[in-house]
Amino acid sequence: MIKPRRIGHATFETPDLPRLVDYYTEVMGLVLAERDKDRAFLATKIGQLAIQINKGDVERCTTVSFEVAPESDFGALARELEKDGIKSELRNDSVPSIGPVLTFKDNKGTTIALFKEWSYLGKHLAHHGIGPLKLGHIAWVVENPAKTAEFYSKVMGFRVSDWISDFFVFMRCNSDHHTVNFIRGTVSKMHHMAFELKDFIHLQNSCDLFGQRKIPIIWGPLRHGPGHNLATYHRNPDDQVIELFCELDKMVDEELGYFEPRPWHQDTPQRPKTWEAGKTSNWGPPPTPEFHRARDAVAAQPAQH
């Protein structure tokens, strides 16, 4: 079993590379670590690679990387994947700060890249914009969330943190409540991507920046139920939904089996569970129509997450 330690970076294709680079540097506050004609690599202010952008015909997320333990044997992992009928390839993609990667496709067609060697990219460089701490999680629309959850559990060692009814599952690979989410829909695509901020003041400052730049907040601020994170949502120039969050639940001891207690928890202790649809926020406004716009691939569901 693979057992990732954390999410690394996500790779996107875009028809307008300069526009998206400008958004991630000037608005999101990521650091442009390296760039050539058709690619750009962006790191957090801490120095971890977070986003790779490739020039392409369609706006989409193609690859997600995960860090595995430094002693991991890629040959042994490849043999384990082969037993599950999954083809893998050991590659060196010349990604700044990342060593060789073992790549394979998950059951929805996204490339997964495992790495065990990495280095910092100019940490603590001056930045503009928001300056998130890290890439926190990615959510996907999938036809069968239970089937995808089974793949991520059996093949990659993820654990289920929560369900909303039977259509939305949250999964973790470390202490963070979720690193991947899967919601039921008719066409597989990214639902949203999330960056972690330091605290509520950091989140408030990001809202002020959105106001200055006339970027609409399409949901929030609010406190979610599953994960209990404070969050806001907006769209980037490629019309993809971006979440900013802080105060996410943590499972600090897997054997105890409950999330680290917080005053806003409604269950004591707060354990993984199935939430009732439509009752999954502690407080805050409902999603705006703009949040749901162009999400025709998602089957009709009650208000989510």
What residue spans do the PLM features occupy?
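Conserved active-site tyrosine of GNAT-family acetyltransferases
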Residues: 20, 24-25, 81, 109, ...
